[in-house]
């Protein structure tokens, strides 16, 4: 989604949100990420300006004080940015890839089933369409945000094809877009 993303070319406009819209977004975030509730006011303080940065391909990035927090495509689900995920790693369930998959994931490739079932990888129970943080064997922080394309059970059984779709990864266009004022 952000492989060829460039802040100067892809951002079309930025709008400050009304309090009622912010409340609706907070409710949607609580519904989507129940574990975020104790930290939501810390992540999105009440008095700080919340803006939506509109980009090409119907991508919207939610910012607070210029810090990129969440993004979504069209009216779809919100995904946390990796910068937010590094501060609050418990927001998403984790899946771990083996060392051999790291370079492919960091170049934007989807996570294949063998990268999740081999020694060094850890596959935790998750349903289809669950948003997950992809961790790497021997590393502390997430290297990618993805969406389960198969359930964890099916990944173990089939062990072929795409297991997790790579949505946002370290060093992609969104990662390089540090803040937006």
Curated annotation (Swiss-Prot):
Modified residues (Phosphothreonine): 81
Post-translational modification: Phosphorylation is critical for stabilization and promotion of cell proliferation.
Main location: cytoplasm
Pfam families in alphabetical order: Pre-PUA, PUA
Top-level division of the source organism's lineage: Eukaryota
Family under the similarity heading: Belongs to the MCTS1 family.
InterPro entries: MCT-1/Tma20, Pre-PUA, PUA, PUA-like_sf, Uncharacterised_CHP00451
SUPFAM superfamilies: PUA domain-like
Job of this protein: Translation regulator forming a complex with DENR to promote translation reinitiation. Translation reinitiation is the process where the small ribosomal subunit remains attached to the mRNA following termination of translation of a regulatory upstream ORF (uORF), and resume scanning on the same mRNA molecule to initiate translation of a downstream ORF, usually the main ORF (mORF). The MCTS1/DENR complex is pivotal to two linked mechanisms essential for translation reinitiation.
Single GO MF descriptor: translation initiation factor activity
Signal peptide range in chain numbering: none
Domain annotation PUA: ranges: 92-171
Gene: Mcts1
Location in the cell: Cytoplasm
Record CDD domains: MCT1_N (cd11609), PUA_MCTS-1-like (cd21155)
Entry keywords, A to Z: Cell cycle, Cytoplasm, DNA damage, Growth regulation, Initiation factor, Phosphoprotein, Protein biosynthesis, Transcription, Transcription regulation, Tumor suppressor
Modified residues (Phosphoserine): 118
Protein name, per record: Malignant T-cell-amplified sequence 1
GO cellular component: cytoplasm
GO BP, sorted A to Z: DNA damage response; ribosome disassembly; translation reinitiation
């Amino acid at each position: 989604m952000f492989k060829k993303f460039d802040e100067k070319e892809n951002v079309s406009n930025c709008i400050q949100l009304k309090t009622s819209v912010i409340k609706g977004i907070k409710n949607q975030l609580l519904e989507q990420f129940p574990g975020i509730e104790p930290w939501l006011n810390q992540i999105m303080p009440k008095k700080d300006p919340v803006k939506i940065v509109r980009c090409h391909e119907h991508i919207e990035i939610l910012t607070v004080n210029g810090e990129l927090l969440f993004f979504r495509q069209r009216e779809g689900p919100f995904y946390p940015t990796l910068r937010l995920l590094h501060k609050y790693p418990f927001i998403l369930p984790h899946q771990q890839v083996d060392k051999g998959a790291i370079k492919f994931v960091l170049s934007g490739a989807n996570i294949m089933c063998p990268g999740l079932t081999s020694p060094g990888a850890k596959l935790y129970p998750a349903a289809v369409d669950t948003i997950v943080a992809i961790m790497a064997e021997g590393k502390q922080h997430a290297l990618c945000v993805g969406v389960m394309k198969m359930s964890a059970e099916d990944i173990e059984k089939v062990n072929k094809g795409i297991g997790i779709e790579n949505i946002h990864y370290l060093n992609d266009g969104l990662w390089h877009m540090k803040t937006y004022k």
